[in-house]
């Protein structure tokens, strides 16, 4: 089964853009970066030529001899015995972290040969760049972050009719109950597989839950091997400990990251490098607290208070040893972690949409906490997340009374509605946040 990925549309827009720069594609392992590059190349270019610096280490010598992009093109074409024609060929530089000279060459392609289309990517690129003290040609490349398959992409593959219905909406009003129930069902299935392509395909091809679990476990095992292969020896046990503490961190009523959950007596200074490694690898999202929702929101970040979420809700479920049946048919004692899964899934949906304005969270001097706060244009918007239809709790009200935002949001399993500044949205539709904000600003802007 083919899953249509939205990143292909980003690539298509880049292909014909003026002042185009080479793309440097970032993202966690096993999210489909190579597939996306190759699919785009095959569908949108006459020729697609891939260079893999891990499997073809001899390629490094080509880049070590010259920095002239025109000469590089000639030698690469000879090496691969394929034509490289400006405007007709996509060049893919895969596993580019294995060749620093190839990474640096992107600068010269940008400056001296922008007519060539190049997309570069690598495994654990952020980790490798830091470890080897490599220089990324900032300003000379277009950096794109790729994420796991979103629920939006999942729904298109699993229930295209419901997807098209949501796409056709032009106003915020109650959805028919049949549509809402379909969304709830598919969303719970998505929380089982998460967005890792192998797991999604196993689920949607009806290969059985055992195959989904096997796919997720294989990825978790690969991540464990990455710790040993790419991290500094002294950091390996710390990275391992943080990663395996995520279910416990998120099971707490207060999901703030607590070092003593990792190990009694653990201190921040001992684990900061390990946290950074996981962030650089794209395996976790760190969401910081803010002292107040001011503009720009980044100015109010409190670096000593943060929550840590997994890059993918399916991996988080498997890491927690949570049976798939508990997610699709919740049981009584599935409570705190249900909330954690709901938050992780919503965060996963909005991450690709907030651009460089990363999400934060807010706490009052008392006990109120708003799960996420984002800067959207000239607004600071609080986002509350509820796992089901029970929306009791006063945190969003406390925030509203304190700061009086124009708009506030609640993602739950309730129906779509906008009332007096409160946008209530089914959590499955968080991935359409840009659509809802456009409607809100056009219709309800104060």
Protein language model regions, located:
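Short glycine-rich substrate-engagement loop in P-loop NTPases that contacts/grips substrate
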Residues: 55-87
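Accessory nucleic acid-recognition modules appended to NTPase machines
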Residues: 201-376
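Hydrophobic positions on the alpha1 helix immediately C-terminal to the Walker A/P-loop
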Residues: 36, 40
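Conserved lysine of the Walker
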Residues: 33
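Conserved P-loop NTPase "ATPase switch" module shared by AAA+ and STAND
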Residues: 84-102
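Interdomain motor-coupling "hinge/lid" segment immediately C-terminal to the ATP-binding subdomain
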Residues: 129-251
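N-terminal pre-Walker A segment at the start of P-loop NTPase domains
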Residues: 1-16
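Structural recognition of the conserved hydrophobic beta-strand(s) that form the central parallel beta-sheet
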Residues: 92, 117-123, 145
């Amino acid at each position: 089964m083919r899953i249509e990925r939205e990143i292909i549309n980003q690539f298509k827009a880049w292909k014909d853009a003026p002042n185009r720069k080479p793309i440097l594609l970032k993202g966690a392992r096993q999210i489909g970066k190579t597939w996306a590059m190759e699919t785009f190349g095959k569908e949108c270019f006459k020729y697609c030529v891939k260079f893999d610096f891990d499997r073809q280490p001899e390629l490094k010598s080509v880049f070590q001899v010259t920095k002239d992009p025109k000469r590089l093109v000639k030698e690469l074409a000879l090496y691969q015995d394929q034509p490289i024609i400006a405007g007709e060929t996509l060049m893919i530089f895969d596993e580019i972290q294995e060749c620093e000279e190839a990474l640096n060459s992107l600068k010269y392609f940008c400056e001296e040969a922008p007519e060539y289309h190049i997309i570069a990517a690598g495994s654990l690129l952020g980790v490798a760049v830091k470890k080897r003290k490599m220089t990324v040609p900032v300003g000379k490349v277009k950096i794109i972050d790729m994420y796991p398959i979103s629920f939006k992409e999942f729904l298109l593959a699993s229930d295209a009719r419901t997807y098209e219905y949501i796409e056709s909406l032009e106003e915020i009003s109650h959805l028919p109950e049949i549509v809402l129930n379909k969304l709830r069902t598919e969303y719970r299935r998505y929380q089982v597989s998460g967005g890792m392509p192998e797991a999604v395909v196993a689920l949607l091809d009806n290969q059985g839950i055992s195959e989904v679990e096997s796919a997720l476990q294989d990825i978790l095992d690969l991540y464990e091997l990455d710790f040993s292969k790419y991290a500094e020896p002294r950091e390996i046990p710390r990275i391992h400990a943080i990663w395996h503490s995520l279910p416990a961190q998120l099971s707490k009523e207060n999901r703030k990251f607590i070092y003593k959950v990792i190990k009694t007596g653990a201190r921040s200074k001992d684990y900061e490098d390990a946290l950074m490694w996981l962030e650089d690898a794209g395996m976790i999202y760190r969401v910081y607290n803010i002292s107040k929702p001011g503009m720009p929101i980044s100015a109010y970040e409190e670096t000593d208070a943060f929550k840590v979420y997994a890059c993918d809700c399916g991996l988080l479920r498997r890491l927690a040893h949570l049976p798939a049946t508990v997610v699709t048919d919740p049981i009584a004692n599935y409570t705190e972690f249900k909330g954690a899964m709901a938050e992780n899934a919503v965060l996963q949906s909005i991450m690709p949409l907030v651009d460089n304005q990363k999400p934060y969270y807010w706490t009052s001097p008392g006990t109120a906490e708003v799960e996420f706060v984002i800067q959207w244009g000239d607004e600071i918007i609080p986002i509350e997340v509820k796992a089901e239809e029970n929306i009791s709790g006063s945190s969003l009200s406390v925030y509203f009374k304190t700061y009086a935002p124009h708009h506030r949001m609640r993602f739950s399993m309730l129906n779509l509605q906008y009332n007096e500044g409160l946008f209530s949205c089914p959590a499955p539709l968080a991935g359409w946040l840009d659509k809802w904000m456009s409607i809100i600003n056009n219709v309800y802007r104060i």
